[in-house]
Structure formats: C-alpha cells, structure tokens
C-alpha cells in the first residue's frame, strides 16, 4: 500500500503570488514534473488553495516518503531547485494533517 500525506501550508503575506505563479508554471512544465516525481517514487501530488486564499493544502502519495525525501534532497533536476526556492519564498509550514483513512482501487 502506498503512503499518503496532506499538509496545510500558510502562504507568506506579500508573497502569495509567487506560489500561485509557480503553480501555473508547473502545469506548463508537466513533463519535467512527472520525471522528477518518478525519480522520487511519488505517485501523485496535488496542491489546493484554501477558500480564504491564505493557505494551501498539499497532498502527496508515494511508495515511500523516506525514499522520496532522499531523492529530493539529492536531486540535480533544475525544477527541484526552483521548487525549493519558490517554497522557501512563499510558504511556511503550518501543520501536517492526520490520516484517518486512505483507500486505493487500482487496476
């Protein structure tokens, strides 16, 4: 079974647009994103904007978060470096939400 994680991150006041622009850019660079996710063993990754636009919710599904973290830290992909920079500039950790359940149906 895969591992899942949902994290609530606060957008840094004054830097919200940096993250929103980055999210749009990621959609344009889909092939780079999928290449790095594959390298990390990440099966899916999603980001959602809260209704008040002060937070984002970040969902990840991976074979192993330990492996994903190691691969991310050792990554030489340009997009990973850019992602870290944008995250540092525009997001601050708020809380990791507790998983109550996760079901998978894959064929």
Where are these regions (language model features)?
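N-terminal secretory/targeting leader peptides
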Residues: 44-53, 63
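Short, flexible turn/loop "capping" segments at secondary-structure junctions
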Residues: 1-3, 50-51
């Amino acid at each position: 079974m895969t591992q899942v994680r949902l994290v609530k991150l606060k957008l840094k006041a004054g830097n919200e647009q940096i993250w929103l622009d980055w999210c749009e850019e990621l959609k344009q660079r889909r092939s780079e994103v999928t290449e790095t996710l594959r390298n990390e063993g990440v099966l899916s990754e999603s980001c959602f904007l809260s209704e008040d636009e002060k937070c984002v919710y970040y969902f990840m599904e991976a074979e192993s978060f330990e492996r994903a973290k190691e691969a991310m830290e050792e990554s030489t992909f340009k997009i990973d470096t850019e992602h870290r920079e944008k995250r540092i500039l525009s997001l601050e950790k708020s809380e990791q939400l507790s998983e109550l359940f996760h079901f998978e149906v894959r064929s």
